Structure formats: structure tokens, C-alpha cells
Amino acid sequence: MQPSTENPNRIPRRQFLKRSAGASAALLGTQFLGLVSRETVAAALPDKKNIILFLTDQERPPMWWPEGWDDANLPNTKRLKERGLTFQYAFTAAAMCTASRNSLFTGLYPAQHHAAATLTEDYAQSPTEPQLDPSLPNLATCLKEAGYDVVYKGKWHMTSRVEAADGTYIDDDISRYGFDEWGAPDAGGDTRKETFGGADALHTVKNDQRFIDDAAAWLSNRLSSANDKPFCLIVSLVNPHDCLSYPNQYDEDGGYEEDRKSVV
């Protein structure tokens, strides 16, 4: 995918690296590799602004559409690009869900954090599916050392649950990794045709709506409270992972109708 030459907000790579090399490298790079102390990380943070981090699941840049298609059909994406930075040569560390998420939060390759397999959903920890080592520094532990409250809302899928009395997920399942609050249960992918769009197995809860509602409620309560500690709120959405439905006529228009009948 060639970089756009029409984006007035585009910053040359050399200039971006020069600007961000100081605090960003010290904070997120060397700390994860254990080359600087946690105290250095805490001191490197400037004014300790509040942080809200949104994650989407299995989303990639539009690559095969005509020029201008994404701006015309993805208005919210266009708005975000116009008001922020777009990294056009960014690559995921792994194709597998669990491995990629663990790399994102630790800054390590799967061969380094060792949680390289996508974890089986709805099962407790398995010896054949290595878990992320809680002793490894990650985004949450670094921010907590810097005085932040770190709250996670949404899809986790970085570790399997710790066996609770009733076998369900509990908030403590991710507190081992430095997070102050979660919002169990976890949510993976639900791609059956009757539950397109992130519904759970019982067809009772739209996961992304649940996550957004939980995050909005937490943020409203926090901002109206007397707690003036800086916070990092991570909102991890399931979609577009589950947005797999398409208009019925696409089968016929694309010549797939008979193939579809053979597998339904």
C-alpha cells in the first residue's frame, strides 16, 4: 500500500522519529526490555494526562478499493485520520489474536513473551497454551508505576481465566497484569450468522454495546468524583471481527449461490 501524498497532516518518518525518540523510547521501549528502572519511567512522563485508548479487533487499512473509497464510505475513520496521526507502514507483530495482543501490551515479539498461541475460548488455563508471564512489564504495570489508575473495558483474550469457584471469568483474572478494574466476562468472536455483530452465545448481550456502556459509565463516574489521580482507560472492542454479514443478493451476484447451498 503506497503512502498518500494528499494528507496535509503527514509527518515524515525521520521527523516523527526525531520528535518522539526521547520520552517515547525511554518510556515504552527500553522499559519493556528491562534497560531502565521503573522510577525512570515514572519521571519521564510529563504532565500525566489522562489517556483513553480504543482498540478494534482484526481491522486493517483498506487496500483493494478504488482511490477515495475509504474516505467516501468510512466517514468516522476519515475524521480520525484528519485529527490525528496515521502510521502507513505499521505492521502487527503476529497474525494470531492472543500473540498480537500480548505483543501490543508488552512491546515484545511472541518469541520473547512466549504466549504465541491463540487461546481456546471458554476454557481454563491449559499447559499446551502458554500464558503471558505476569512478571513481564506491560503497559498497565508501567503506567501504575507512574501513578496511574489503569482500567480495562472490553475484549481481553490475552490469557485464559483463573479457575473461579463457578468456572467463570472474574476481574482478578487480569489484575495480575496491573489492571485496577476490568468487567468480566471476556468476549471472543461470535461469527454464527444468527449473531452477527458481536452477540454472545445466549443471544442476550451485544458485546461492543456492553463495553461502550461500561466505559461511558466508568468515565462519567470518575470525572464526577473527587479522585484526581491520572487514569488510563482502555476500551477494547470486538468488532470489526464479527462484521461478516452481507446482503443476500451478493451470493447470486457473485456467482456463489450454489456453493452456499452446498454448505448450509
Segments predicted by a language model, with ranges:
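Formylglycine-dependent sulfatase
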Residues: Q2-V264
